[in-house]
Amino acid sequence: MKNLGFSKKILLAAALIVVVAFSVFIVINDYRQRQSLKSSVKSELQQLGTLTTQNIQTWLESRIQLLQSMSQQVAVDGKELPQLQRAIGLPTYSDNFQLSYFGSTEGVMFSVPAGNRPADYDPRARGWYKAAQNAPGTIVTEPYIAASSGKLVMTIATPVKIQNQLAGVAGADISLDSVSKIINSLNFDGHGYAFLVSAEGKILVHPDSKLVLKNINEAYPVNTPKIATGVTEIDSGKQPEIISFTPVQGVATANWYVALVLEQDSAYAMLTEFRTSAITAMVVVVMVIILLLGPLIRVLMQPLHQMGRAMRDIADGEGDLTKRLAITSHDEFGALAESFNHFVERIHTSIREVASTAAQLGEVATRVVKVSNASMSNSDQQANRTESVAAAINELGAAAQEIAQNAARTSQQSSDASGLASDGQGVVQQTIKAMNELSGKISESCVNIESLNGKTANIGQILEVITSISQQTNLLALNAAIEAARAGEAGRGFAVVADEVRNLAHRTQDSAQQVQKMIEELQVGAREAVVNMTESQRQSEDSVGIANLAGERLGSVTRRIEEINGMNQSVAAATEEQTSVVESINVDITHINTLNQQGVDNLRQTLEACNSLEEQAARLQQLVGSFRI
């Protein structure tokens, strides 16, 4: 069904509609015809059954009237033998009766023809005599096979009264050949038959002589029909049949029914013929509709075929979006063509906008790649300078450690000098010598501290360079974020990377400012140390002069030495603090270097994303270029 064309589907639908319509018509008409025909068959069977029973009734009543006439003649003439011979021996009786007879109350039996009866034959013991002597009128027995002739006969008998006294019973045996001829004449052209049955179910006359005097159950072992007035349909096991029962009226003692049996197939043969004709007509109509609708549908489907070709040209051809369908009608196909043109117009406009956007996206991606390359270069320079700062700070730490060691040695020597001064005047010269050495050490310390001060100044300049680089990185990240915002949805990922770079640059700038602040504090401490060392040198020179002048100043010198010792301890403490600061700066510089490396990695990923974006933009331009706009 999916592989059928639309035209074939329309033809199939039309054929199905016709088939369904004819099928419904056939079913409904078949039902109505069946009901009508069934009613007609029932009516005809009932009429035929009534006519048949009337014929049987007329035949039987005529015989009964003959018997009654004979009995009346016997009653008038008397029951003596001559009178009986004259009354019963009439030719009319012998023509209609197989046997005519009279049985008197004295037991005398007279019949025509005489027949062969035993000498002790007594009619009063016979069933017909007993049934008739007490009956108000003529009685009719059930048919039976006569022993003398072997034919199917029945007996009619009527009481004979003389002066209202029973004189005997007149009777006659009647052959049922005439009734059988009436019944067997109804063969319905070989499609049915008739039979005579009693109300008790005994078959009296039947075309099949084997069933005569048998019960109806033997004729219909399956679905035995109920003997009652009316028409019924049964399935005898051989074929469905219609059977009608009509009672024989007019004779009270003859409770008989005429049964008419008709084959259903023959009764409803007209329906089969009509059904065959209707199916043939349906096939002819379907073929005519297919032959007429085929060319008509092909003509009506031309606009749809044109739209299909136009769509294939757009899909499989050069993608020419400038073509439009010609609208030649205002029906559904015209509306469909107009909708198709409107759809192509919208696609045309969208493709033009996509082409423009793809070109802009390619340009933006190219610029972002250039900016990312520049940022990569700046980041490499920043990493190199950060390594230089780290090396300088390591040197600063080494110098601070050396100052601390010198301060410790100076403190030790001051302690020794104080001990020697306490020993006495004799060691003054040694003290002077020690003071001279101390003065030299202090001078050396001043030089070292001044060198430290100069190096911290260099560190400040390096930090200014780091701050400047961070500011430039921040500006570059800001420019990259602006360019990513212009790129729209395609630059969203790059905007996130640019924002991360800008945050790293800002954090680098903050760390550099903190380092700058620490270095300034270190420079202040170094200047204070220089001042203190200068003062110590001056005091040492005064102490040497005083030592040369007088020994009594030894105590004062000792106190001064102690002061110098305290100052040296302060210098040692300041130097240790400077060492701690330098280590902290070293940690910060290492962290800055790590962050800078992360920034380089992020820039590298950004550059890869930009290259992919540039490739996608080129692919988009290639796809858009496949359409003619």
Curated annotation (Swiss-Prot):
Record field: transmembrane: 10-30, 277-297
GO MF annotations in UniProt: transmembrane signaling receptor activity
The keyword Nucleotide-binding is annotated on this UniProt entry: no
Main location: membrane
Gene Ontology biological process terms in this record: chemotaxis; signal transduction
Recorded coiled-coil stretches: none
Gene disruption phenotype: Mutant does not respond to L-Asp, whereas chemotaxis to D-Asp and L-Glu is significantly reduced. Mutant shows increased c-di-GMP level, a modest but significant increase in biofilm formation and reduced swarming motility. It also shows reduced virulence in tomato plants.
Ranges of the Periplasmic topological domain: 31-276
Descriptive protein name: Methyl-accepting chemotaxis protein PscA
Organism: Pseudomonas syringae pv. tomato (strain ATCC BAA-871 / DC3000)
Lineage: Bacteria, Pseudomonadati, Pseudomonadota, Gammaproteobacteria, Pseudomonadales
